[in-house]
């Protein structure tokens, strides 16, 4: 229910005023739960008023996000009585020409970046007058890309600002070290040593190594510099890249982290979303959590994926956990979600911010916790610190027991009134 004179609605309307003043062209970087979708709704309502016969196109990266607009009962189009709106998943959109008054690109990070061809196609295939790009967070290369197209920042609003305003639940990001067992530690150490042996060829410079992977001419330049044959440099490129993939896959499937995610979820018994980088890991977690858990990943049919989301949202079922592999980082909202757990990750800040956003929707009395499980003294720890740079409310713990103590202490302080949770 939208309150027309609430501080949030007044702020959202001010964002639209800034957008119009900028020629009705620009992007907003607004955290999940603060109301970025309603800013899109306001832009559509303005277009409906000024151009009642003109079409509006919304481009989204996934069916989940499309459903948020088109659902016959709870979609934004239905709830707000929007007219002349058509919603497209981006892969379908770029297959044909389009003509509209307003083009909205939701989760624009999927169509922007130094190497992105998708944004070019969306723009080139669309004749439009107004452009609004929505996202919760962008990395620097996305911003540079958009600025190059003359798409400027209209408004930035962070999760901490949302908490301070009382629009999001207070939260903590708790980083918990999970050790490798003896056999896995030996395996990782050998793998990492082999990686570094070949990395030395490129002066331990990731950019040089990746340039050699993608640019054959640069390999020749480096071979001349080192006094090597091209065959030898090609072998180093192959072995470095191969060992990087092996190390990554190993860290994506660490059994001790998967088992820790299961134990923590069972112990805390909060409504929980679990994130990882492998379907096998997501499957194992779902199986261990039993009937209380559903899955969501790319190997499922669209029908089954939608059904599983419905089971989690429906308070009448026993389902309270969802295990996801490279999915649900965006476009999935459930105010009751209180706990997030990441058991494998990449180094990208974008993914970490989006996953955190899944648990921050405001719910009375809720404090949200996001648990980051990592293997200390490995590349996984470096990925963790990279992904959490500039993140607020981050605590590095020593053990799972310390995690339990923090949450129990918070509960006690809420009950005795020491912590004021709205």
PLM regions: where:
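Conserved interdomain hinge at the start of the Helicase C-terminal
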Residues: 183, 187-196, 245-288
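Conserved helicase ATPase core of P-loop NTP-dependent helicases/translocases
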Residues: 67, 273-275, 280-329, 351
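Post-DEXD/H (motif II) to motif III coupling segment of the RecA-like Helicase ATP-binding lobe
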Residues: 113-171
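Inter-Walker segment of RecA-like/P-loop motor cores
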Residues: 63-99
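Walker A/P-loop
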Residues: 23-43, 275
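A short beta-strand element within the Helicase C-terminal
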Residues: 100-104, 323-324, 330-346, 351-352, ...
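Conserved pre-motif I regulatory segment
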Residues: 1-29
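Conserved segment of the helicase C-terminal RecA-like domain
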Residues: 358-387
């Amino acid at each position: 229910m939208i309150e027309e004179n609430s501080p949030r609605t007044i702020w959202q309307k001010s964002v639209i005023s800034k957008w119009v003043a900028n020629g009705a062209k620009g992007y907003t970087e607004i955290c999940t739960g603060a109301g970025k979708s309603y800013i899109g709704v306001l832009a559509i309502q303005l277009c409906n008023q000024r151009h009642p016969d003109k079409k509006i196109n919304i481009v989204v990266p996934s069916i989940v996000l499309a459903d948020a607009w088109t659902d016959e009962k709870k979609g934004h189009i239905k709830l707000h009585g929007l007219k002349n709106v058509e919603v497209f998943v981006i892969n379908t959109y770029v297959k044909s020409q389009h003509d509209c008054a307003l083009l909205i690109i939701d989760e624009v990070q999927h169509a922007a970046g130094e190497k992105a061809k998708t944004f070019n196609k969306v723009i080139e295939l669309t004749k439009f007058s107004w452009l609004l790009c929505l996202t919760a967070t962008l990395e620097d290369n996305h911003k540079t890309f958009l600025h190059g197209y003359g798409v400027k920042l209209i408004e930035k609003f962070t999760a901490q600002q949302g908490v301070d305003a009382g629009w999001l639940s207070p939260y903590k990001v708790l980083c918990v070290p999970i050790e490798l067992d003896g056999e896995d530690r030996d395996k990782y150490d050998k793998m990492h040593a082999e990686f570094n042996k070949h990395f030395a060829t490129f002066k331990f410079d990731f950019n040089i190594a990746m340039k050699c992977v993608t640019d054959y001419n640069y390999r020749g330049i480096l071979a001349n510099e080192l006094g090597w044959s091209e065959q030898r440099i090609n072998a180093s490129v192959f072995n470095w890249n191969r060992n990087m993939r092996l190390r990554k896959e190993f860290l994506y499937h660490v059994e001790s982290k998967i088992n820790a995610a299961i134990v923590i979820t069972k112990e805390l018994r909060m409504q929980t979303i679990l994130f990882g980088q492998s379907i096998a890991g997501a499957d194992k977690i779902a199986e261990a959590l039993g009937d209380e858990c559903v899955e969501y990943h790319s190997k499922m049919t669209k029908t089954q994926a939608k059904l599983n989301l419905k089971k989690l949202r429906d308070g009448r079922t026993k389902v309270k956990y969802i295990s996801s592999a490279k999915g649900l980082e965006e476009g999935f909202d459930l105010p009751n979600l209180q706990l997030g757990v990441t058991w494998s990750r990449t180094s990208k800040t974008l993914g970490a911010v989006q996953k955190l956003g899944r648990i921050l929707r405001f719910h009375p009395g809720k404090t949200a916790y996001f648990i980051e499980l990592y293997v200390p003294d490995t590349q996984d720890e470096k990925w963790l610190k990279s992904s959490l740079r500039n993140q607020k409310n981050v605590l590095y713990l020593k053990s799972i027991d310390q995690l339990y103590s923090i949450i129990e202490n918070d509960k006690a302080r809420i009950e005795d009134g020491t912590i004021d949770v709205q």
